[in-house]
A protein has these predicted regions:
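C-terminal catalytic "cap/lid" subdomain
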Residues: 1-243
Length: 243
């Protein structure tokens, strides 16, 4: 039974290996030879008193039948919940990220012109115990981790790539309206009105707001992966800014 923090570390290396080689190859295909691509195994500190630990809500792993879920719960003391009518999955805590442990190294690499893959899977969740970092049984939300990373690197824009070109209010209804350019205040209003689904667009919009309001001039962009270029050019996507 591998600890969840170790599973995150393994997935960072596994996925990072493929991603960095794909990026390296694409750079070379474009005759760009002076940029190094590197994956940083990234630990992210969480608060052991975060309320999320008392209310696990993040589904992980494969879908199971009720009988399989009961067996896993008894065998490993997992918390299992029904998910979207497709079966049962394990749920774990999803605490807010507080500190990126390797931020100094990441910043040095970025400042030197390297292309850095960091905070994979939201980061390896750890709790500080004196000088020791203890792995936590949790999964950190990737959008919040990205917002924290962007703030720490003093980025101008946070780009959140997802499965749709723009965020929308009244999604999936006849009143559906795509959002192009909105202020932080408008985004907070839409969040309060419940327009964004938990576990889907809601954390993306919350992370976008968190970054956009963190300093003057910062903006967040939510768009489709295939439309990233057009989004950066201001031609599509949902852009969130302070005023």
């Amino acid at each position: 039974n591998t600890p969840l923090s170790v599973c995150v570390a393994m997935s960072q290396a596994y996925i990072g290996y493929y991603l960095q080689n794909a990026l390296r190859e694409e750079l070379l295909n474009r005759n760009i030879t002076d940029i190094t691509v590197a994956t940083m195994i990234t630990q992210v500190r969480v608060d052991e008193h975060d309320p999320a630990f008392a209310c696990p809500s993040k589904p992980i792993g494969r879908f199971l039948t009720k009988e399989q879920a009961d067996e896993m719960s008894q065998k490993y003391d997992y918390i299992m919940k029904e998910d979207a009518g497709r079966g049962y999955r394990r749920v774990v805590a999803s605490p807010k990220p507080q500190e990126i442990i390797e931020i100094g190294t990441i910043r040095t690499m970025v400042d030197s012109g390297d292309l850095v893959i960091a905070c994979g899977g939201g980061g390896i969740p750890v709790i500080r115990q004196g000088n020791h970092l203890k792995g936590a049984s949790a999964v950190i939300d990737k959008d919040f981790a990205s917002a924290l990373l962007a703030k720490e690197l003093d980025a101008d824009v946070l780009i959140i790539l997802t499965a749709i070109e723009k965020a929308a209010i009244h999604f999936g209804t006849p009143e559906q309206t795509w959002l192009d350019d909105i202020t932080v205040a408008e985004a907070k209003q839409y969040i309060a009105e419940g327009h964004f689904a938990p576990g889907s667009m809601l954390p993306k919009m919350q992370a976008a707001v968190e970054f956009a309001e963190s300093a003057p001039g910062r903006q967040s962009l939510i768009t489709l992966l295939e439309k990233a270029r057009e989004g950066i050019q201001g031609l599509t996507g949902t852009r969130i800014h302070l005023e």
